[in-house]
Amino acid sequence: MTTTLPANPPPFGGSPDLAGRVRRRFATGRAEVSPAAVVEAVRETGGPVLGDRDVLRLAARVHDDLVGAGPLGPLLADPEVTDVLVNATEVWVDRGDGLRREPLSMASPDAARRLAQRLVAATGRRLDDGAPYADAILPDGTRLHAVLPPVATGGPYLSLRTFRRHPFTLVDLVARNTVPPPVADLLAAVVAARLAFLVVGGTGSGKTTLLNTLIELVPRDERIVLVEDAAELRPAHPHVVGLQCKTSNVEGAGAVEMTDLVRQALRMRPDRLIVGECRGAEIVDLLRALNTGHEGGAGTLHANAIADVPARLEALGLLGGLPRVALHAQAAAALQVVLQMRRTSTGRVLSTVGLVAAEGPDRLVTVRPAWDRATGVAAAGADLARLLATRGARVPELLWGAER
């Protein structure tokens, strides 16, 4: 019979000594740390008589401490939690409305260090005094970054970005007030018209969430190829293939970079090419791809406002050896729409929809607001409506007035 432990067990009120004895039984590493083995160890370890429910609760806690995320396990299992941060013993959590200090804390900085080292080691990577920081992807998709002292001056520090098992749909984002209902129709029209777009914003603003949601709107008969530094996008779409970067081995060889992956993706017959985060020379390959028949592509970019996007593209283009004038020419032809995400005190919101245009004698790229959360439809709304109509897409009601 298969033993299943509670995924998010309630607090166990039994003896901490009993839990410690059970942990020590597995400390040698010779015994398999399976749910059934932990339950058996709880029953065999001398102590107070426990009912089945308490046995399962204690076993779940011990199992999580040995192979899971320890005291952070319940937080990572909470579907509302997006980020869990550990500063030595302090635990901070973001549930979509900003960081909040949790009543929970790590037992000691050493306990935080041991947890970080165990989680990183389970992914085949190293975290110790000789390699004091590491990135890892946990088996459930959670992204982990850990830094040890003395590099972490008050650490250790752990940063965990959770993986949402049931991604948000566009309906969900409307219900959460991330996207107003009329703008949801506009976003659907952008995808249907195969307009290439960038989702921009600061760290933790919801860029990946919105991109994942919009990918799900791609017609089911199209093939989507994802290129990411670390796999985060999990769209509910029947034909998605993904590529992710690979770090070098201990000899410093074997790394696979984003630029390599974009070029490989172009050989995989993509109907839509999606670059999870443009932060280097791969922007050059993406723009070239979008200009050679791969319409409807998308990506994310760190930028605090739509007006900052051209300068950000310039900086990334230089990393790929693309001169300023050539970068602007490529971007003007390849990109049509920019979506600005922002994190507020009440949650993450879509703040602006911008239209990419080339202006002036040098034909430099600008991004003009077509819709703004504070002011509504803006000057470029009419141009966006005409572009959608030209592409054969239904112009959403939001832009009806602007179209005339």
Model-derived segments and their meaning:
Residues 207:
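Conserved lysine of the Walker
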Residues 1-127:
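N-terminal accessory targeting/assembly segments
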Residues 347-404:
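NTP-binding/hydrolysis catalytic cores, primarily Walker-type P-loop NTPases
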Residues 164-175, 212, 216-263, 309-313:
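P-loop NTPase switch/communication element
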Residues 78, 92-193:
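P-loop NTP-binding catalytic core
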Residues 199:
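Hydrophobic anchor at the beta1->P-loop junction of P-loop NTPases
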